[in-house]
Amino acid sequence: ERLTLSAFTDKDREAYNTLCLDDERNKWWGYDYRTDWKGEDLDSYFLDVVREDFTKKRAINFAIRLDGKCIGEVLLYRFDGKGGAEEGCRIAPEYGGQGYGVEAFRAVAEWGLYQCHLGHVVAKCFKENDASYKMLSSCMRKKGEDEKFFYFNKEV
């Protein structure tokens, strides 16, 4: 495999901030940081949130690394208390379309299921997001849809 997944470090700050501040790319992420941002220093805000979410057991975020460089993020979050979690993934635009998202997404889904013993991992994507639809379809089973999203599931 071409990638490594590991915890974010202070050395990732610039690349991670760029990823988090990319409004065009993040419209597909389904979350706008401005919802929770209270004016904190943006230079440290995003990594601080990652660390706080981990400490409070709300999420496990992994830096996606290519040759040691942070090129994206994959995470498990929204743990449901019944053995399930939701997964999300985003890749910096200059690395998109090369299969990195699929590789990272599959690795974390399998880690969650087979190492952490989750019973299922779910994900969703906007209907207009062809790249995410292809990524999710390659490693999960489509479970349904509504007007806005396609929903996917992976079980042990």
Regions inferred by a protein language model and the residue ranges of each:
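A short helix-loop-beta-strand connector motif used in the catalytic cores of GNAT acetyltransferases and
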Residues: L47-F62, G72
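Acyl-donor (CoA/ACP) binding surface of acyl/acetyltransferases
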Residues: E1-K27, N61-V156
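Intrinsic structural disorder
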Residues: W37, Y45, K57, G97, ...
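Short, conserved alpha-helical segments within structured domains
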Residues: R34-K38, I60, E128
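Hydrophobic residues in alpha-helical segments
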Residues: C20, W29, D53-T55
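Conserved GNAT-fold acetyl-CoA-binding loop/helix
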Residues: N26-D48
